[in-house]
UniProtKB/Swiss-Prot annotation:
<feature type="binding site">
    <location>
        <begin position="186"/>
        <end position="193"/>
    </location>
    <ligand>
        <name>GTP 2</name>
    </ligand>
</feature>
<dbReference type="GO" id="GO:0016887">
    <property type="term" value="F:ATP hydrolysis activity"/>
</dbReference>
<feature type="binding site">
    <location>
        <begin position="298"/>
        <end position="301"/>
    </location>
    <ligand>
        <name>GTP 2</name>
    </ligand>
</feature>
<feature type="binding site">
    <location>
        <begin position="56"/>
        <end position="60"/>
    </location>
    <ligand>
        <name>GTP 1</name>
    </ligand>
</feature>
<feature type="domain" description="KH-like">
    <location>
        <begin position="354"/>
        <end position="438"/>
    </location>
</feature>
<dbReference type="GO" id="GO:0005525">
    <property type="term" value="F:GTP binding"/>
</dbReference>
<feature type="domain" description="EngA-type G 1">
    <location>
        <begin position="3"/>
        <end position="167"/>
    </location>
</feature>
<dbReference type="InterPro" id="IPR015946">
    <property type="entry name" value="KH_dom-like_a/b"/>
</dbReference>
<dbReference type="InterPro" id="IPR027417">
    <property type="entry name" value="P-loop_NTPase"/>
</dbReference>
<comment type="subunit">
    <text>Associates with the 50S ribosomal subunit.</text>
</comment>
<dbReference type="InterPro" id="IPR016484">
    <property type="entry name" value="GTPase_Der"/>
</dbReference>
<dbReference type="GO" id="GO:0042254">
    <property type="term" value="P:ribosome biogenesis"/>
</dbReference>
<keyword id="KW-0547">Nucleotide-binding</keyword>
<dbReference type="GO" id="GO:0043022">
    <property type="term" value="F:ribosome binding"/>
</dbReference>
<protein>
    <recommendedName>
        <fullName>GTPase Der</fullName>
    </recommendedName>
</protein>
<keyword id="KW-0690">Ribosome biogenesis</keyword>
<feature type="binding site">
    <location>
        <begin position="233"/>
        <end position="237"/>
    </location>
    <ligand>
        <name>GTP 2</name>
    </ligand>
</feature>
Length: 445
């Protein structure tokens, strides 16, 4: 699983600026999804082939006793507990503050690797910036400018060396014989533990707990109708005897890690509650990660016809960017609708891993263009020549041609829908990339 970097510090030291710099490469992936809201406290970054999750904890007041500062402090402590590395940010312009000492005292007791980072150091000599902060007892301070990027690359590379060194071997979790890897995610109390037990029930369980690649992760292998599956870190579920129960604390970090590690995500919603921003945030991360998705609307048996119509309308309105995914209305407690849900899991995985031959893709593209040509932009009309597959999980379709900058978002959606229909790509995000043609025959005939 991806390691977690937690950004910690008192208010206004530049945590959000550093967060935005570390996660900027991810922004464009979800910018054009209608209806998607984003939680800016959690994001993903990547250095070369090493991805990581980064958490912006908000201003930390470790001694706060009540109110919003106490709540923020509690959330920060949880993020630190789950982090592989903590980046403790202080302000080089304003110097050492009493709050910095309180935070340092707390962090030393956690046992986590701590990187002391002095921000806003642009234009200042290292000795002038760093001297005050040695008394925190956290080793050599690293001077950076989050706003200008100075020193950030070296700092995050060092942090990732430590974070990845603490990651156990991943061979077992990547073993293809374990079957489709499923993450069941959702808000607290939507019925995740009930669904897990319905899936692996005592008579079917071929389950064993395995230490995962992060603290407290679990992997549970099971078979259903002769097919193998693996449940990965079910984000707040732990075994008690033969049954899984929800633990008291909902972990966003573990939810994001399990999504990243899954082949297919089941997003579980509560039919008796309106869809929340948190539901949309989780769904948005699934799309951003390119994971196959099935939606389960639980506790459906407790609704009358009017409430069911209202719940369906709420789903369509608030999660319209998930129109590629199938929705199932289930009762995990009564085990109704679960067979169809799992068939959609199989279908979504098959779609995500589909192989799309170049001749068929190109034919589908040409037929789509013949049915509806892209609009002109001034005197220019885009010419779409041919298509090939650029990747799987999620499928990536690369389209070659000329004047491709003039292709509108509306036309991209049209092409996406045509490809989905032609190749039965239900349940998986679909990426389309346009490239200027270097086909030597593109302009002939």
């Amino acid at each position: 699983m991806k390691p977690v970097i937690a950004l910690v510090g008192r208010p206004n030291v530049g945590k959000s600026t550093l967060f935005n710099r570390l996660t900027r490469s991810r922004d464009a992936l979800v910018a054009d999804l209608p209806g998607l809201t984003r939680d800016r406290h959690y994001g993903e970054g990547r250095v070369g082939e090493r991805p990581y999750l980064v958490v912006d904890t908000g201003g930390f007041e470790p001694v706060a006793k009540d109110g919003i500062l106490h709540q923020m402090a509690r959330q920060t402590r949880q993020a630190v507990e789950e982090a592989d590395v903590v980046v403790f940010i202080v302000d080089g312009r304003n110097g050492l503050a009493p709050q910095d000492k309180s935070i340092a005292d707390y962090l030393r007791k956690t046992g986590r690797p701590i990187f002391l980072v002095v921000n806003k150091a642009e234009g200042m000599k290292y000795t002038a910036v760093a001297t005050d902060f040695y008394e925190l007892g956290l080793g050599d301070p690293r001077a950076i400018s989050a706003a200008h990027g100075d020193g950030v690359t070296d700092m995050i590379n060092e942090a990732l060396e430590v974070a990845y060194a603490g990651q156990p071997e991943e061979a077992d979790e990547d073993d293809p014989s374990r079957g489709i890897k499923i993450a069941i995610v959702g808000r607290p109390n939507v019925g995740k533990s009930t669904l897990v037990n319905a899936l692996i029930g005592e008579d079917r369980v071929i389950a064993f707990d395995m230490p995962g690649t992060t603290r407290d992760s679990i992997y549970v292998d099971f078979e259903r109708n002769g097919k193998k599956y693996t449940l990965i870190d079910t984000a707040g579920l732990r075994r008690r005897g033969k049954v899984f129960e929800a633990i008291e604390k909902f972990s966003v970090v573990k939810t994001l890690q399990s999504i990243s590690d899954a082949n297919v995500v089941i997003l579980l919603l509560d039919a008796q509650q309106d869809i929340s921003d948190q539901d949309a945030h989780i769904a948005g991360f699934v799309v951003e990660q390119g994971r196959a998705l099935v939606i389960g609307v639980n506790k459906w048996d407790g609704l009358d016809d009017h409430a069911r119509d209202r719940a369906k309308a709420d789903l369509t309105r608030k999660l319209k960017f998930l129109d590629f995914a199938k929705s199932h209305y289930i009762s995990a407690a009564k085990k109704t609708g679960i067979g169809a849900l799992m068939r959609s899991v199989d279908d979504a995985y098959a779609a995500a891993m589909a192989k799309l031959p170049t001749p068929k893709l190109t034919r589908a593209l040409i037929e789509a263009v013949e049915f509806q040509q892209p609009r002109r932009r001034g005197p220019v009309r885009p010419k779409l020549r041919y298509a090939h597959q650029g990747g799987q999980n999620p499928p990536l379709i690369v389209i070659h041609g000329n004047a491709l900058d003039a292709v509108t978002e509306t036309y991209k959606r049209y092409l996406e829908n045509r490809f989905r229909e032609t190749f039965s790509l239900t349940g998986t995000p679909l990426r389309i990339e346009f490239r200027s043609s270097n086909n030597p025959y593109a302009d002939k005939g």
